[in-house]
């Protein structure tokens, strides 16, 4: 089974700390509950992170599905998350900006979270929730930026990254 191949990815920072991503909504390598998908309420799950490296000034979160038939599909882009923030709560608002935290456009063409919605009968897809610790307070992008623009601005500023993986399929 796909779940047995999945490990929690951690990256050592220069200071030796291990940044870790977790969720109270699902366990790493296990199925994402229906409420967080297009078959449910399509609300975002809780995502948290800990053991961030010294010097972290902001975070970026990117959720994607590398198993989509059209290539990697971006479900969520969140950036300029303040350094003191250690989680995004369940049902994070689908608006361009919340208390300085900005959200980009997903591949559904909308701002904010777009839950798992793989083609029926396509089997399990893996959904990566990636958190990046950055050395800058802001990427200098307006709300509604593309993933590509966010990744270009992150280049050379990543102190650490980690992710968890959730699974989902539609029969």
Swiss-Prot record:
UniProt superkingdom: Bacteria
Family: Belongs to the UPF0098 family.
Name the record gives this protein: UPF0098 protein aq_1250
Pfam annotation, one family: PBP
PANTHER family assigned: PEBP (PHOSPHATIDYLETHANOLAMINE-BINDING PROTEIN) FAMILY PROTEIN (PTHR30289:SF1), UNCHARACTERIZED PROTEIN YBCL-RELATED (PTHR30289)
């Amino acid at each position: 089974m796909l779940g047995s191949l999945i490990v929690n990815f951690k990256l050592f920072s220069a200071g030796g700390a291990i940044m870790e991503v977790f969720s109270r909504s699902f366990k790493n390598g296990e199925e994402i509950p229906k409420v967080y998908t297009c078959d449910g309420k399509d609300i975002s799950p809780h995502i948290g992170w800990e053991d961030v490296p010294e010097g972290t000034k902001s975070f970026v979160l990117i959720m994607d599905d590398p198993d989509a038939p059209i290539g990697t599909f971006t479900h969520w882009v969140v950036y300029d998350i303040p350094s003191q923030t250690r989680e995004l709560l369940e049902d994070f608002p689908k608006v361009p900006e919340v208390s300085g935290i900005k959200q980009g456009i997903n591949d559904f063409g909308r701002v904010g979270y777009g839950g798992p919605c793989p083609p029926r009968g396509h089997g399990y897809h893996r959904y990566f929730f990636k958190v990046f610790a950055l050395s800058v307070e802001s990427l200098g992008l307006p709300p509604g930026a593309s993933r590509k623009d966010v990744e270009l601005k992150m280049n050379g500023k990543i102190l650490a990254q980690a992710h968890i993986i959730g699974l989902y399929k539609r029969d």
